[in-house]
């Protein structure tokens, strides 16, 4: 792990952030890129940690979400696609959806696309547009690129993070991010 950390400092990982929505100050000096799966219980735990970081360091930290739905979680892909569809409309709505998916993760697991659509409505999205975009080539290509990027970084599970170029895999306490 120490060797990998040193390698990341020498040659930082550079996730593609072009056109991605973020939570927190877009010009913050620290960028946390989270590779997430909306059905992953460890990803759900990480939401509280991310909130602590954003609240503890206002203006200093921003969060960018990358989609890495695992095959073992069949409802993670529709949720991932919807997050990105909503991001095309409004970043704030996409992040409200992110919060809702983790707050009501059991409903996502049980209800799948039906809950994804309900959540899009609840965050105030243009649902017909979101449903079109959810199935569209642009959103599908974006999620496929996120998956490939995470695999290219050697990530084998979720959550995984890249913090200013340095990788962290798994759920971590706040202290590991600062």
Predicted regions and their residues:
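A short beta-strand-turn-helix
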Residues: 14-30, 55
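Short clusters of hydrophobic/aromatic residues that line enzyme substrate/ligand-binding pockets
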Residues: 23, 108, 168
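Short, flexible turn/loop "capping" segments at secondary-structure junctions
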Residues: 24-27, 75-76, 160
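C-terminal cap of thioredoxin/glutaredoxin-like
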Residues: 1-5, 35, 51-52, 114-178
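Short, flexible loop segments at the rims of nucleotide/cofactor-binding pockets, characterized by
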Residues: 10-11, 41, 138-139
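Long amphipathic alpha-helical scaffold segments
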Residues: 2-17
